[in-house]
């Protein structure tokens, strides 16, 4: 099926949100699975709400997610002549007509239909009037008066609509601009799109678009409508559920492979498997495993999954990724230094922001170590400071200041004074890092270096 063509068609009226990102991922995976093409189209016909900054943001998010597209980027705003040529074709073939009914009258028709318990729709007053173009006039599709539209949805199975409930939809507005459904059908057909995967909030558009495909003599693509992503409370996902735009997840310190993995699993499954490399997703993805029931967004699970990818990433790559977050904390440090630190700290973070923060005490000079008051009160007692001074003397005379040497120096002090490790280690740990937590003490000491460690111990003794 190398002739498979899918598309993603966002509107640049906001940043790319996770629902749109999931749609893009599904279409990208389907195209890549079959060795087909993935088209990216910017639906910017709403000139009042469309902004270049949002287009730029969407493109940046697509690239960050690793979703490349084939061919040129398509802008609907540059294709009005093409849309109008197809509208003219529909007028010439009798599948469309001019309508002069003003919007307030059309709304009145719909209210009258509602009052009778009918679907609110235009009553077709101008269908047989043979009007031509004129100020304030629109072009409408002449929909069949009866019949059913039935199609095999890739997710929902057989779906049917009663044609009598459909409106004679507007194809060209009074200002000459084509409408959404007309532009989408013309674009998908002329670009050879074979499969349309989208959210089920678009399901009501599908019968209208099928009528247009039929009127224009185009072959129908396969449609698949995936359920919307819900919040943990099973209501429509929103920011109050912790959902963010893709750009916010990037700024928050998530890894793109984690977000892709998570969003794919919100609507697609392959047995009980949770973690997939991108290449594995391309290999295994298929519409037959798209879920017909809505999935709930779980920010904690996303955090867990991101933590997994943090720990699977090589130290060198993770250092490169966390570098800008460390810089945002105010530190000028090179990636090679971070590559030494991240193996110690990535178990203690689930995102890059957290990783940068938990390494902070390793990057400040001794004079700027921030001490936790409770930890100081508990560990740096008079006895605790005496142990810190003793360990300091043992460390100062080490020949090689490495992990093994630091560990032996602490051990020798403990053994030589008839003490237990738990009597000494907490005080030394607080002296070095300012708090009780952190990775192994000898590991941190070795990475800090002799001068820094001794300076930290001296400062703690003087508290």
Swiss-Prot record:
One of its GO terms (molecular function) is glutamate-tRNA ligase activity. It is an enzyme of class 6 (ligase). The lineage of its organism: Bacteria, Pseudomonadati, Thermodesulfobacteriota, Desulfovibrionia, Desulfovibrionales. HAMAP family: Glu_tRNA_synth_type1 (MF_00022). A motif ('KMSKS' region) lies at residues 236-240. This is Glutamate--tRNA ligase. It is found in: Cytoplasm. It catalyses: tRNA(Glu) + L-glutamate + ATP = L-glutamyl-tRNA(Glu) + AMP + diphosphate. The keyword Chloroplast does not apply. Monomer. PROSITE patterns: AA_TRNA_LIGASE_I (PS00178). Its EC number is 6.1.1.17. Keywords: Aminoacyl-tRNA synthetase, ATP-binding, Cytoplasm, Ligase, Nucleotide-binding, Protein biosynthesis. It comes from Nitratidesulfovibrio vulgaris (strain DP4) (Desulfovibrio vulgaris). Belongs to the class-I aminoacyl-tRNA synthetase family. Glutamate--tRNA ligase type 1 subfamily. A motif ('HIGH' region) lies at residues 10-20. PANTHER family: GLUTAMATE--TRNA LIGASE (PTHR43311), GLUTAMATE--TRNA LIGASE, MITOCHONDRIAL-RELATED (PTHR43311:SF2). The keyword Protein biosynthesis applies.
């Amino acid at each position: 099926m190398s002739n498979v063509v899918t598309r993603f068609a966002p509107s640049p009226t906001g940043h790319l949100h996770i629902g749109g990102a999931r749609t893009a991922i599904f279409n990208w995976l389907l195209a890549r699975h079959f060795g087909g093409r993935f088209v990216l189209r910017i639906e910017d016909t709403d000139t009042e709400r469309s902004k270049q900054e949002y287009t730029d943001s969407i493109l940046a998010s697509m690239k960050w997610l690793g979703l490349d597209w084939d061919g040129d980027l398509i802008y609907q705003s540059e294709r009005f002549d093409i849309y109008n040529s197809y509208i003219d074709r529909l007028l010439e073939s009798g599948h469309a007509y001019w309508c002069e009914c003003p919007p307030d009258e059309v709304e009145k028709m719909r209210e009258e239909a509602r009052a009778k318990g009918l679907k609110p729709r235009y009553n077709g007053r101008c269908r047989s009037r043979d009007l031509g173009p004129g100020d304030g006039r629109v072009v409408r599709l002449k929909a069949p008066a009866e019949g059913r539209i039935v199609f095999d949805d890739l997710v929902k199975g057989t779906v049917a609509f009663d044609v009598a409930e459909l409106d004679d939809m507007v194809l060209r507005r009074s200002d000459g601009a084509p409408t959404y459904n007309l532009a989408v059908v013309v674009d998908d057909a002329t670009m050879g799109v074979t499969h349309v995967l989208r959210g089920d909030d678009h399901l009501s558009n599908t019968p209208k678009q099928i009528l247009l495909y039929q009127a224009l003599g185009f072959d129908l693509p396969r449609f698949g409508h995936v359920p919307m992503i819900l919040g943990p409370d099973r209501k429509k996902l929103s920011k109050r559920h912790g959902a963010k735009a893709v750009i916010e997840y990037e700024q928050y310190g998530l890894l793109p492979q984690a977000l892709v993995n998570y969003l794919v699993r919100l609507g697609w499954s392959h047995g009980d498997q949770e973690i997939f490399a991108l290449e594995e997703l391309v290999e295994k993805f298929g519409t037959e495993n798209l879920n017909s029931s809505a999935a709930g967004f779980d920010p904690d699970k996303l955090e867990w999954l991101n933590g997994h990818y943090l720990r699977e990433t090589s130290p060198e790559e993770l250092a490169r990724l966390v570098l800008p977050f460390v810089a945002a904390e105010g530190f000028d440090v090179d990636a090679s230094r971070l590559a030494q630190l991240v193996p110690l700290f990535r178990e203690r973070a689930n995102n890059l922001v957290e990783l940068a923060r938990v390494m902070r005490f390793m990057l400040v000079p001794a004079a700027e170590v921030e001490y936790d008051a409770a930890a100081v009160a508990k560990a740096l007692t008079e006895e605790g400071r005496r142990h810190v001074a003793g360990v300091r003397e043992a460390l100062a005379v080490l020949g090689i200041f490495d992990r093994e040497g630091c560990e032996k120096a602490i051990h020798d002090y403990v053994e030589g004074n008839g003490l237990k490790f738990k009597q000494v280690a907490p005080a030394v740990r607080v002296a070095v890092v300012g708090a009780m937590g952190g990775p192994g003490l000898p590991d941190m000491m070795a990475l800090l270096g002799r001068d820094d460690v001794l300076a930290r111990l001296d400062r703690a003794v003087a508290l």
